[in-house]
């Protein structure tokens, strides 16, 4: 039996691609969490809104350092410590 991996997807520059990848990584049965760094997601953009709808349905954890969101807000220092818990970090 395969060991379940913890995967962190770091969202910064290529937001739409990061969100699509996060959705795809869930197909392997691994634990996937999102870390949104220094930005807001443009939910009016269908390339962002569609994968975010799936991410919400899958109940993935979403962390951010931007306080103007409905996601779990943590500092960069807290993010750095939390990332040590993951087997893989995928930056975008």
Per-range role (PLM):
Residues 4, 29, 59, 85-87:
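Short, well-ordered alpha-helix to beta-strand connector turns
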Residues 4-19, 38-43:
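Short, glycine-rich nucleotide/cofactor-binding loops
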